[in-house]
């Protein structure tokens, strides 16, 4: 019986699957929008949302404690190390803690959105965009003739 077995295998070894989701998590944090298959997007959501919660905890500590206190520094470093332990990407960890903690401070979960976008041309796999909610909209450049 498959009781209490969380996640899908995606036809990969455990090390390949783990590396794939670490890379996808870092890409989602850096770009805030990625296109992938629908099952991978659903699995990625369960990985990224706890990372954003770590950033929120650090932001909450920043407001409660003195930033120069040893207690804040110790807890902040511990939270960043937890995130780095999974992501292994300094740029992604920095962006996670400096931008997302403040951005999602008032939101109680649900930091990602999955939008279905049809089927892949080669094998008809269902595709989806996964994006971070409340991301800043980039205005497209308008050509002037």
Swiss-Prot record:
Family per record: Belongs to the bacterial ribosomal protein bL17 family.
What Gene3D superfamilies is this protein classified in? Ribosomal protein L17
Q: Name one GO cellular component term.
A: cytosolic large ribosomal subunit
Q: Name one GO biological process term.
A: translation
GO terms (molecular function) for this protein are: structural constituent of ribosome
Q: What is this protein called?
A: Large ribosomal subunit protein bL17
Q: Which InterPro entries match?
A: Ribosomal_bL17, Ribosomal_bL17_CS, Ribosomal_bL17_sf
Instruction: List, alphabetically, the NCBIfam families matched.
Output: L17
Q: List the disulfide bonds.
A: none
Pfam families according to UniProt? Ribosomal_L17 (PF01196)
PANTHER family (alphabetical): LARGE RIBOSOMAL SUBUNIT PROTEIN BL17M, RIBOSOMAL PROTEIN L17
Traced from the root, the source organism's taxonomic lineage reads: Bacteria, Pseudomonadati, Pseudomonadota, Gammaproteobacteria, Thiotrichales
Origin species: Francisella philomiragia subsp. philomiragia (strain ATCC 25017 / CCUG 19701 / FSC 153 / O#319-036)
Kindly state the subunit structure of this protein: Part of the 50S ribosomal subunit. Contacts protein L32.
Superkingdom of this protein's organism: Bacteria
Q: Which SUPFAM superfamilies match?
A: Prokaryotic ribosomal protein L17
Query: Which UniProt keywords are listed?
Result: Ribonucleoprotein, Ribosomal protein
Matching PROSITE patterns: RIBOSOMAL_L17
